[in-house]
Amino acid sequence: MADKVQTTLLFLAVGEFSVGILGNAFIGLVNCMDWVKKRKIASIDLILTSLAISRICLLCVILLDCFILVLYPDVYATGKEMRIIDFFWTLTNHLSIWFATCLSIYYFFKIGNFFHPLFLWMKWRIDRVISWILLGCVVLSVFISLPATENLNADFRFCVKAKRKTNLTWSCRVNKTQHASTKLFLNLATLLPFCVCLMSFFLLILSLRRHIRRMQLSATGCRDPSTEAHVRALKAVISFLLLFIAYYLSFLIATSSYFMPETELAVIFGESIALIYPSSHSFILILGNNKLRHASLKVIWKVMSILKGRKFQQHKQI
């Protein structure tokens, strides 16, 4: 029964992976083509491209871990290969979260309407420093990933190996204090960007409220470009926050799996939930970006035209 559930979850993970690769690859391809055409890249496109690349890597690492867990479980008993996978999973996980946080910060400074001198100074400087901020996210993610991977790897692999040798439901003997401190470190590391996104979300709501009040006093109406920009930014940020909560819970399931009777099943269940976040959020970003939305509509129109042409030719031959 457990094998059937694992196989079903693996097929589900493959479907989520395919959808996520399609959406994120589309974002990266459109922005890179525009970069080559104009020989420069806008800050928002740089953030979206970096986010798409990190999520493609994250999707690949998670799916690879799912395949190894179901098809080649004995690999978990070795240290070198799984340590590499754990490192890249932790690295791409933090990169995708921090890049999404950078996107929320960028929306706040470019769309928010505040008149504080510090805010205006940051609003003017954000395009100049965004590349350095992204580079800082990479350095920070590497700094977080190295020690965390070593501790989690040692605890989890020992547990899986012990279970396979003794065939008992509970035979893991690990340093729970060390494991708890490692989990706490990882959770706090992801809590910081979540709080920053949450702060950006509430400040954007405050900015939208002030803008609508100002439009009502001037009797110009509320449906202006600035209001629409606020709404699109809020949709992108709130979708990230909700999906991040689901991803965070799945991450807790995966990292705490050896406290459960079916360790492998718990891991792949958590990973199948985790794939929802990098897969679905890309399409929300596409719908919220004018250039990406128009490009996606063109692709859909061309695909439909090709399909209609083939149907017409088949009907004509008949």
From Swiss-Prot:
The answer, when asked if rRNA-binding is one of the entry's keywords, is no
One GO cellular component term, please give it. plasma membrane
Report the glycosylation sites: N167, N175
Q: Name one GO molecular function term.
A: bitter taste receptor activity
The membrane topology term of the UniProt record is: Multi-pass membrane protein
Q: Where are the transmembrane segments?
A: 10-30, 56-76, 95-115, 129-149, 188-208, 236-256, 267-287
What keywords sit in the KW lines? Answer: G-protein coupled receptor, Glycoprotein, Membrane, Receptor, Sensory transduction, Taste, Transducer, Transmembrane, Transmembrane helix
A UniProt-annotated Pfam family: TAS2R
Tissue expression from the record: Expressed in subsets of taste receptor cells of the tongue and palate epithelium and exclusively in gustducin-positive cells.
Q: Give the Extracellular compartment stretches of this protein.
A: 1-9, 77-94, 150-187, 257-266
- Indicate yes or no for the key word Glycoprotein: yes
Q: What else is known?
A: Several bitter taste receptors are expressed in a single taste receptor cell.
- Recorded family membership: Belongs to the G-protein coupled receptor T2R family.
Q: What is this protein called?
A: Taste receptor type 2 member 7
